[in-house]
Amino acid sequence: MNKLHFGASYYPEHWKEERWAEDIRLMREVNFTVVRMGEFAWSTLEPAEGKFNFDWLDRAIEKLAAAGIVSVLGTPTAAPPAWLIEKYPDLLAVNENGRRVQFGNRCHYCVNSPDFHAATHRIVSAMAEHFGANPAIIGWQIDNEFNRVCYCERCQKFFQQFLASKYSSLAALNEWLSTSYWSQTYSSWEQIPIPIGAHNPGLMLEFKHFVTASYRQFQKLQVDLLRPHLAPDVWITHNFMGWYGGYDHYEMAADLDLASWDWYVPTGHHDYLKSGATHDLTRGFKRKNFWLIETQPGNVNWVPINNSTNKGEARAMAWHAIAHGADAILYWQWRSALGGQEQYHGTLVDQSGKPRPFYEEAQMLGKQMQLVSDLLAGSRMQARVAMLNSYDSRWSIEFQRHHGDFDYVAHFNHYYRALATNNVGVDIISADEPLDDYQLVIVPALVILNEKRVTNLTNFVQRGGHLVLTIRTGMKDEYNALLPSRQPGALAELAGVEVEDYYVLDELVPLEGNLLSGTSKQWAERLKVLDSNMTIPMARYSKSNGWLDGQVAMAVHSFGRGMVYTVGAYLDDPAQQKLINHILQIAGIRVLETPEGVEISQRVDPNDRVIYFVINHTAEARVLTLPWSGFDHLTGRDVRELQLEPYGAAIVTRSDQETA
């Protein structure tokens, strides 16, 4: 079973080799168990075409291993070197304005370039053959933070081929993408452009699918080169960027062994009610624990105000990530580079080679992680609540927000926060996943319906599940065309309501009900009850624009053995909290009350013992009385009352659950 790992990104190629021993000594003192290396080292690993220089990395891996530190290697394809660009200049990506990007940054490649694929094949094959059997390497990272979209003529041609392989004919494409609108009908595949700006919504959605397919193909090229050379327990990952929306992460994660992500707080301080959702999202990519493979040791360097985290805050952030399923915490980076674009980014060791003040905080965290590594081995979250995430629905909204401030992720987090405030564990999973393990499922803005989604949701409620449908759900088909029926489309019978009309709001609209009163912002749907015997209005709009006055804003419908809540309003925070509190109670989901800013999350070990993470996310001390006696594994003490220092944490098991 996996143990906890603690470490950082390390770039030995930046420093003279005689310095490495001191770096490794400091790493051991800070209780590192792992480093990530190599992901930007292409020009050092292959200084000229086909001329490989792996000796330096061999020595670094060996020296680290001798100190008990294992390695994760990154394939260096995010940083194609100058000699490669000079030989193959059209390897550079083209931006949406038709200009080639400039060498000197990263991820500057066209993901569909055959020359780039050939160069990738060469460097990754050589690394796999050379390093693949090294027992000191426990995992591999493919590339780094996939993000570039290319608009070159080659990508346009491949996009046309992608469409031709998906649609049986141009006639089918024209029909499904509604190209008769504005005389967009295509008579040859070669006429189809890469959509830019306010283009055909169906074609825009297909281009997102094409970008996903392109990156997945490029990633799989590397996975397939690596895997034959790796032991079964050596994993392959890619470092995702949380809620980044450039591609479908479920598709991208399918070929990987492990999901990982890079967590940064640009300005201000972390909000655990928000960041928890991103951890849960990443855990959902593979439905298992993940690695936090990059996070900040202090500040970032790429926003207008790059403030540092408070003393102790990064430690609370680390326990927060682990509580939500992270099995590793790696800081970016170990030491400040003397040059390059990230000179001012936070590190553990400064440009002089001396530890920064943050080093002591990391040292404490590393020691604590060692204390509980065995305790947490094999443990995972077990949630009874799921939230369904849909990239195609998100893209559909982003193409046509209708209200400029309407944001899919913000709306998603609006529901998540109300759950997290109650310390309720949540799985964030694909909208196409089965729902057998849950008591409550929340479906935020599932614009796009398909047969699988309708079937899964219907079966879930039929079996006794509680379902929440929010605004904008069930508007479109999988081609991003409006359904020829009212919202929520094929879910209308399940919901017991249909949307007579929807209204974009330029001001708050009041609503009232027996359960709650409040306001709706940005968006309001006028619900029509289809079966008054089985459907109860929960709230109605008060006087507003005339169209909404007295109309149903929320309703609950009994279906099979379950219940469906349709929320046609974008509720204010207090009303939202009341609604979720009520639904949790009805659904039989246990909540845990804590002082403001204190989180309780749970992991369950292979023996079904619950491990409680109690984390103070504030700069002030907090006191919490547990409803049972327990043992704090960080202090080694029996506890009933927890006195948490600012950003302090406790990892507690119940005394009545202790095993021999």
Name each region found by the language model.
Residues 97-258, 262-275:
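Polysaccharide-binding and catalytic clefts of secreted carbohydrate-active enzymes
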Residues 2-4, 31-33, 65-71, 133-138, ...:
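Short, well-ordered coil/turn segments that N-cap beta-strands
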Residues 22-28, 36-100, 222-230:
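Aromatic-lined substrate-binding rim segments of carbohydrate-active enzymes
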Residues 15-29, 120-126, 241-252, 310-318:
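Short, acidic/polar
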